[in-house]
From Swiss-Prot:
Protein name according to UniProt: Ribonucleoside-diphosphate reductase subunit alpha
Induction: Part of the probable nrdI(ymaA)-nrdE-nrdF-ymaB operon. Expression is constitutive but low, dramatically induced by thymidine starvation which requires recA.
One matching Pfam family: Ribonuc_red_lgN
Single GO term (MF): ribonucleoside-diphosphate reductase activity, thioredoxin disulfide as acceptor
Family designation: Belongs to the ribonucleoside diphosphate reductase large chain family.
């Protein structure tokens, strides 16, 4: 492509990298945004004389749903839009504007013209959340236009649209051990995938390869055959060609098929075995870590023989208690393995392909508030959703199915930097909780019965956070420092406090709690023990100054909250989890999730041109605080995630960043340290090719 064919905004964006006086020209990105609007967005946005004409057109032509708009008078709707436009919001970087208009803004059916600006999308989402309450809609507008809170991609993309996918993006399905159950799980996975959801499945109950069916030995194909079916199903069923279907399979490490399961992700694997798009995760109980640490032989088990012997599925049982009994029981079929060799294989595979994800099962369940419903047995596609589940049993045509509890989770994220600048933790957490609750209550997924049942019974939501590294760097705090952990400790304690408080307030307002609340550690009061006995306020003066003007809940406040919950209960069974925040963090001009950045200046290729995205807030005076994840001490990153994790009732999508010079032994050491520090899950392991490094720090 010749220079004059490259759009002006791309040329300006590229000029960031042309040094002037030995420094990058970060201001060129603002010029690129200006050009993008003047030369492209404004030229390609459909013109309407006024808001009335615009809304009438969008409703009549089936772009917007009429139902939620009809809850308001036109004057009220106008007020909400006025609130959004009064902010005079400007995208600070080309990438943030490009991501919004490319991925989220409503366009004409032929995709050629733009029908929504950022303010329009926010107003529509706010009107949808507020359900007829104009004042609340304005509060939501302010929350989103100030970029204090960001709904997840499916919610932000779909809310208010007539032709849309679901507002919930994340589903977890239990799979029972019969052909009826397996085929029903594949069917439900395809239905959810069609709605744009990512689906993860627990395969730990399935018979291992070579187990008996109706006492006929060597009859079963094992979990890999089911994985192949799922792999094809997700590739077939996507959201009308817009979002690709995506799925994950989890397996307990004590399942006999664990080696075959891992081999599906080997780069050299045979086509008959390899799964191309299905992600995989391994569930590791403490017992396995103990056997590896002591360098003892371990056994993996044929799960159906356990079910026949004990009447319970292996993944529902406590391995610390049952492992030796399984080993000693001659009726439980088993195979001997070397646990260290298996951990080495896990490390090798992760440095090769990034998979599998890892869930340390006992770290999850030691602090799980709802073990009375079920322990947590698997996670989701991004390894941050951790909830109780109960397997369904699908019978033949004229018999009644037993519907269990599957999992759905609707997500959203606080933008730490803006919440801290506006000193609005309490307000933001409570409004965000309300918006997520509305999404949960309006979601009704009819073709996934156990998801539908659980959504009504469990009322789970997942509030997360983004821009941790950006906030720390712009305040001159190194991500790996004790001060950074001190900030995170206080901030996430406060998020937890206000999230519990709002959940209890909603329970009081509605006179309703989540199903089986009575057996939870919220009801017994045990959940609050550490908070009424430990002060989580900042230890460093610099960090205390950041919270100036905000009330930090004290142990006394926690005692009062404990009493309030004892009186009114909790509306949500699960409240907090930290998702990876991919494209949505670009729109927010935010560093992703609570992870360190991967690059100070990202290079992206779109079509025939390159674009550059300097990390939000990056400047020559804070360059070294934007340290790249691959240059960090991963043990310190583990410490940061462990600090945050103690305040998050579910999980954190935690990526490991590895250099290609690391050995499998190095990775095993990080894993074992993560396990020791109480980390619940590890998402991808990303490996960087260090042979291509070039130093940019001299040109700031």
């Amino acid at each position: 492509m010749s220079q004059n064919q490259v759009p002006k905004w791309i040329q300006l964006n590229n000029e960031i990298m042309i040094q002037k006086d030995g420094k990058f020209q970060f201001d060129k990105d603002k010029e690129a945004v200006h050009s993008y609007f003047v030369d492209y967005i404004n030229q390609n946005t459909v013109f309407f004389h006024n808001l009335k004409e615009k809304l009438d057109y969008l409703v009549e032509n089936q772009y917007y749903e009429e139902e939620f708009l009809s809850l308001y008078s036109f004057e009220d709707i106008k007020e909400v839009f006025k609130t959004a436009y009064a902010k005079k919001f400007r995208f600070p970087s080309f990438m943030s504007a490009f991501k919004f208009y490319n991925d989220y803004a409503l366009k004409t059916n032929d995709k050629k013209k733009i029908l929504e600006r950022y303010e329009d999308r926010i107003s529509i989402v706010a009107l949808f959340f507020a359900n007829g309450d104009t004042e609340k809609a304005k509060e939501y507008v302010n929350l989103m236009i100030n970029q204090e809170y960001q709904p997840s991609t499916p919610t932000f993309l779909n809310a208010g649209r007539k032709r849309r996918g679901e507002l919930v993006s994340c589903f977890l399905l239990e799979v029972n051990d019969s052909l009826n159950d397996i085929s029903r799980a594949i069917d439900i996975s395809m239905q959810l995938s069609k709605l744009g959801g990512g689906v993860s499945l627990n395969l730990s109950k399935l018979r291992a390869k070579g187990e008996a069916i109706k006492d006929v030995e060597n009859a079963t194909k094992g979990v890999v055959g089911v994985m192949k079916l799922l792999d094809n199903a997700f590739r077939y069923a996507d959201q009308m060609g817009q979002r690709q279907g995506s799925g994950a399979a989890y397996l307990n490490i004590f399942h006999r098929d664990i080696n075959d399961f891992l081999d599906t992700k080997k780069i050299s694997a045979d086509e008959d075995v390899r799964v191309k798009t299905l992600s995989i995760g391994v569930v590791i109980p403490d017992k396995f870590v103990e056997l590896a640490r002591e360098d003892k032989a371990a056994y993996v088990f044929y799960p159906h023989t356990i079910y026949k012997e004990y009447g319970q599925h292996m993944d529902e049982m406590d391995m610390n208690e049952m492992y030796d009994k399984f080993v000693d029981n001659p009726r439980v079929k088993k195979e001997k393995i070397n646990p260290r060799k298996l951990l080495e294989k896990l490390a090798m595979l992760r440095s090769e392909s990034g998979y599998p994800y890892i869930m340390f099962q006992d770290n999850v369940n030691k602090v799980h508030a709802n073990n009375h419903i079920s322990k947590v047995k698997f996670s989701n596609l991004c390894s941050e959703v951790l909830q109780a589940s109960q397997v369904s049993s699908y019978t033949d045509y004229d018999e009644e199915d037993e519907i269990g509890l599957d999992i759905s989770c609707n997500l959203g994220s606080l933008n730490i930097l803006n919440v801290m600048e506006h000193k609005s933790i309490e307000k933001t957490v409570k409004l965000a909780t309300d918006s997520l609750t509305h999404v949960s209550e309006t979601t009704d997924i009819r073709n996934a019965p156990a998801v539908r049942r659980a959504n009504k019974a469990m009322k789970s939501i997942g509030l997360g956070a983004m821009n941790l590294h950006g906030y720390l760097a712009q305040n001159g705090i190194a991500y790996e420092s004790p001060e950074a952990r001190d900030f995170a400790n206080t901030f996430f304690m406060m998020v937890n406090f206000y999230s519990i408080q709002r959940s209890a307030e909603i329970a009081k307002e509605k006179g309703e709690t989540f199903d089986q609340y009575e057996g939870s550690t919220y009801a017994t009061g045990e959940y609050f023990d550490k908070y009424v006995s430990t002060d989580f306020s900042p230890k460093y003066e610099k960090i205390a100054n950041l919270f100036e003007g905000m009330h930090i809940p004290t142990t006394e406040d926690w005692k009062k909250l404990k009493a309030f919950v004892a009186e009114h209960g909790m509306y949500h069974s699960y409240r907090l989890c930290i998702a990876p925040t991919g494209s949505i963090s670009y729109v927010q001009s935010s560093t992703a999730s609570v992870m360190p950045i991967m690059e100070r200046i990202e290079e992206r290729t779109y079509g025939n041109s390159k674009t550059y995205y300097p990390m939000p807030g990056l400047a020559s005076n804070n360059w070294f605080f934007y340290k790249e994840a691959y240059d960090m001490d991963m043990f310190k990153v583990v410490d940061m995630i462990a600090t945050i994790q103690q305040h998050i009732d579910q999980g954190i999508s935690f990526t490991l960043f590895l250099k290609d010079t690391m050995t499998t032994r190095d990775l095993n050491r990080i894993d074992l340290y993560a396990h020791h520090r109480g980390i619940k899950t590890i998402y991808y392991a990303r490996t960087k090719d260090t042979g291509q490094d070039s130093c940019l720090s001299c040109v700031v």
